[in-house]
UniProtKB/Swiss-Prot annotation:
It catalyses: D-xylose + NADP(+) = D-xylono-1,5-lactone + NADPH + H(+); D-xylose + NAD(+) = D-xylono-1,5-lactone + NADH + H(+). One of its GO terms (biological process) is D-xylose catabolic process. Binds 2 Zn(2+) ions per subunit. Catalyzes the NADP(+)-dependent oxidation of D-xylose. Is able to use both NADP(+) and NAD(+); however, the enzyme shows a very strong preference for NADP(+). Is likely involved in the first step of the oxidative D-xylose degradation pathway. This is D-xylose dehydrogenase. Induction: Is induced by D-xylose. No significant levels of expression can detected when the cells are grown on various other sugars such as L-xylose, L-arabinose, D-galactose, D-tagatose and D-glucose. Homotetramer. Its EC number is 1.1.1.179.
């Protein structure tokens, strides 16, 4: 007879853009609606979501719209509910550490957005609590599950690049100020006092991307900027942008084999897109190069590399983009958030650690913190090892 395990997941902060679109709409609901998933031993795992948020009207509306039986505006009661297995958090950064700490001390498994905390000290404390509590803790590392980066990582594993020399990334798009056209990101993102800022937000992503594609991040040199000093909030009220809206970073990396690699990532909410995707990474090596976005990845082997000659007197006649070949998926690649959710849920049921946990998240917070320090002190800063 087939065994069935029911996992109850409380989802806090799903009225926000990412919490709703990626975690609820494209991950948990499709898993639920498919009847769950089956483990290697034949056990059927079914998901029961519980929607949690501060706005009762929004939460009730979402619950009714998506046929979710349970919802609550009382996070504490949900955390202390013995029938709840997992607390997921996608709320404001400034509220996250307290929520995660409370959940783990109550014996709940946690799955969370990043950053896990506003300070490295808090992030390390969370990692310690998770280890002591013996819960399964997972942190969203969505970009490593995206088709483009899955293909890029495969090229690394196959030795396509030879010795890797560098990785460079371009991320960002124009976020409207909110006066004439509404901003497509929440206003708290641009207020430092509310946990906003490009460096705080994105360096925790870049840490796991650099670790996952290349290797250990050894140092950081960053320059931040607040390019747009005045914005308008959701109510149309003018406010001062106190957080950085762009961050330009240079990183020293080390591959598992001990090779030194230079990384460079530009991140900006004040840039107009002239590239194929909103984020792109280019890896260059002695034997080949590749460019990966969210979905697509193209590569150029050493044997197929053209030999351009600098001549500013003549127009360029060759199309450099046409000289790259698309890397095939060779597999069905699902939504990145959904893939990690399924992996995390399997780990919870099996009672094992998730490969992207709170220590990885702490390294992301550390990189953001040291990036801001690098900007303030105008120097390169070495990154020390974190120990629990």
């Amino acid at each position: 007879m087939t065994k069935t395990a029911i996992v109850r997941v409380a989802m806090n902060g799903i009225t926000g853009r990412m919490g709703y679109r990626q975690h609820l709409l494209r991950s948990i609901l499709p898993i639920r609606d498919a009847g769950g998933f089956t483990l290697e031993d034949g056990t059927k795992v079914q998901i029961e979501p519980i929607l949690v948020g501060r706005n009762e009207a929004k939460i009730r509306e979402l619950a009714e719209k998506h046929k979710v039986a349970e919802w609550s505006t009382d996070l504490d009661s949900v955390v202390n509910d013995p029938t709840v297995d997992i607390i997921f958090d996608a709320s404001m950064t400034s509220l996250r550490a307290a929520t995660l700490k409370k959940a783990m001390l109550a014996g709940k498994h946690i799955f969370t957005e990043k950053p896990t905390a506003e300070t490295l000290e808090e992030a390390i404390e969370l990692a310690r609590i998770g280890k002591q509590a013996g819960v399964t803790a997972g942190v969203v590392h969505d970009k490593l599950y995206l088709p483009g980066l899955v293909k890029l990582r495969r090229l690394v594993d196959e030795g396509f690049f030879g010795r890797i020399l560098s990785i460079r990334g371009e991320f960002g798009y124009w976020v409207f100020e909110g006066d004439v056209q509404a901003a497509q990101r929440p206003s708290w993102n641009y207020r430092k006092e509310d946990g906003g800022g490009m460096t705080t937000d994105m360096f925790c992503h870049w840490n796991y991307v650099l670790e996952g594609i290349i290797g250990k991040v050894k140092s950081v040199n960053a320059k931040t900027a607040t390019h747009i000093p005045t914005r308008w909030d959701e109510a149309g009220k003018e406010y001062k942008a106190t957080a950085d809206d762009a961050s330009y970073g240079i990183f020293e990396l080390e591959t598992p084999g001990g090779d030194d690699v230079i990384g460079q990532i530009n991140s900006s909410w004040a840039v107009r897109v002239y590239r194929d995707e909103l984020v792109e990474f280019q890896v260059d090596g002695t034997h080949g190069s590749a460019v990966a976005g969210l979905n697509k990845c193209v590569a150029q082997q050493r044997a197929h590399t053209p030999k351009p000659v600098w001549n500013p007197d003549l127009p360029v006649t060759e199309s450099f983009r046409d000289q790259w070949q698309e890397v095939p998926a060779n597999a069905e690649l699902d939504n990145g958030f959904k893939l990690q959710w399924e992996e995390f849920l399997r780990d919870v049921v099996a009672g094992r650690e998730h490969r992207f946990g709170l220590l990885s998240a702490a390294r992301g917070v550390q990189l953001a913190e040291l990036g801001l320090q690098s900007n303030d002190e105008r120097r390169t800063i070495d990154i020390p090892e974190i120990t629990l």
